[in-house]
Amino acid sequence: MTSSDAPVVVGIDGSDGALNAARWAGAVAARFGAPLRIVHALPSVGRNLTQTAAAFTAAMMSYQRDMAEAFLKAADEAVRADNPELSVSTVSFNEPADQVLIDASSDARLVVLGGKKVTPAAALLLGSTALSVATRAACPVVAFRGETVAPGDGPVVVGVDDSPAAQAALESAFEFADRFGLAVNAVRSLSLAAPAETGVTIPLLIDWDGVESAELADLTETVDVHNKRHPGVDAKSFIEPDSPGKALLKHVADSGLVVVGSRGRNALAGVLLGSTSLNLLHHSPVPVMICRAAPQGDSDE
């Protein structure tokens, strides 16, 4: 993550889930010795309105500002009750929620998205906000899930492939686990298609035990690099012959956080990210952290 004075930012919408997210973010900020910034996005004001519409809009905006103040006050009080010594600030903006959080990520350690429970019907809407933030934010992003108001004692589960984003996910997972005294379970998905290096195209001709052993050895070696930086963390590696989303879901039931990587920064990247992350966002009982690889030049992946 980043320096100790960088804040943890949490976006709230006034729902019970958002209040829990604020408390969870407060617990994380307190453990990292970082300040907490609670933000709320108000709808933007319409333009070129008739006099009647303008009057109605002004009244509605006044009501929404009052509600925003109430949301922020409730979140501030709940967080301070949990962590009396924590530095907490609140702010609201008349901008789209995703842009508010993307801008806030520029100097943040972590951005937490609090809101209503995600359903399959809400996937596309959520994709336009949470995944927009995740693929464009300058820091890791957590989509809050579950009912907990602080990280528990379950392991941090992290999805690992051979991408730079997976390295970022591993480092974030180990740092989080180290701060909270948790274990790390690294999970790699194993495709059941014939690996190119075998030179054959028929899966039945593949020594899958050998493939799995090789993948496990490679994953363990990758995990060990990060484990050496955080020697107090107990780390285990797992190979799952399933899709990435399903492979991770096999391990999240008793975990406290699941961490995945985002491979890109553009609209297409959001779609690619969604196939795994949206599955987790629909079904994960715990918060989901999405990490981007460190920028490499100006080109999109």
Regions found by a protein language model. Name each.
Residues 1-4, 17, 59-62, 77-111, ...:
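Structural beta-alpha unit
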Residues 2-58, 154-206, 227-230, 234-235, ...:
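Small/aliphatic-rich secondary-structure junction motif
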Residues 37-39, 89-93, 142, 185-187, ...:
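General small-molecule cofactor/ligand-binding pocket signal
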